[in-house]
Amino acid sequence: MAYKPQFYPSATKVAENRRNHINPAFELEKLREIPDEDVVKIMGHRQPSEDYKTVHPPLEEMDLAEDYVRDLVGPINGAKEGHRIRYIQFADSMYFAPSQPYDRSRLYMSRFRGVDCGTLSGRQVVELRESNLEDISKNYLVDTELFDPATTGMRGATVHGHSLRLDENGVMFDALQRYEFDEATGHILYVKDQVGRPWDEPVDVGEPVPQEKLKEITTIYRKDGVAMRDDMEVVEVVKRIHRARTLGGYCPLNEIFDTYL
């Protein structure tokens, strides 16, 4: 019988959202359509019309030694072409942002190949071959329900703000002021790239997701939303993992489980 992964325990809405994010078969809701060149502009690694820089020749032109594993696992397109590794980094407000750092790393590694994730309390960076990174950034990380222009920020440096109160327009604080709320349209406009370099023309990433919808799609446990202490199945799983790690060093010995768990 084929193994069917559970992805995440519990039946609460937050747990369901986390489960959906990690499940590669689940189709994320598309909320906006940001042009490719605008996403490239925000990332700031190359000009929209510029060719991809490479760090090695295309694989088919290289004289590589025989490798059984390489024959089993085909390269992603960026690796085939020798494209360099680049990154995108997100900060997610603790005030009901759709995603958060651990959720991002789980879903990236579950849905995409060739990713390298860095997970901190208030930021999450993912590295990938540049062409593949642009593809997932546009089609998954910005256009879908994973992104809210007000509570999610593309920030390659100086990411502070995830734990601060939202401003009067519901927008997360950004020390580098990479984006601003346009009162005339109600949209969020990026005026700098992810590391804070300013532009002459802004990039419109659309209107903020309504608060009611954020509470429906968030993966963050909050006392004024779905409190984690009330989600007993998740609490028990987390306690079990923590005890196994602390007492057994992740070594699944029966005496550890029988005695302490």
From Swiss-Prot:
One of its GO terms (cellular component) is cytoplasm. Binds 2 coenzyme F430 non-covalently per MCR complex. Coenzyme F430 is a yellow nickel porphinoid. Methyl-coenzyme-M reductase is activated when the enzyme-bound coenzyme F430 is reduced to the Ni(I) oxidation state. Its cofactor is coenzyme F430. It holds the Pfam family MCR_gamma. GO terms for biological process: methanogenesis. Coenzyme M binds at R123. It is an enzyme of class 2 (transferase). It catalyses: coenzyme B + methyl-coenzyme M = methane + coenzyme M-coenzyme B heterodisulfide. One of its GO terms (molecular function) is coenzyme-B sulfoethylthiotransferase activity. Keywords: Cytoplasm, Methanogenesis, Transferase. Pathway: One-carbon metabolism; methyl-coenzyme M reduction; methane from methyl-coenzyme M: step 1/1. It is found in: Cytoplasm. Its EC number is 2.8.4.1. Belongs to the methyl-coenzyme M reductase gamma subunit family. MCR is a hexamer of two alpha, two beta, and two gamma chains, forming a dimer of heterotrimers. Component of the methyl-coenzyme M reductase (MCR) I that catalyzes the reductive cleavage of methyl-coenzyme M (CoM-S-CH3 or 2-(methylthio)ethanesulfonate) using coenzyme B (CoB or 7-mercaptoheptanoylthreonine phosphate) as reductant which results in the production of methane and the mixed heterodisulfide of CoB and CoM (CoM-S-S-CoB). This is the final step in methanogenesis. This is Methyl-coenzyme M reductase subunit gamma. It comes from Methanococcus voltae. The lineage of its organism: Archaea, Methanobacteriati, Methanobacteriota, Methanomada group, Methanococci.
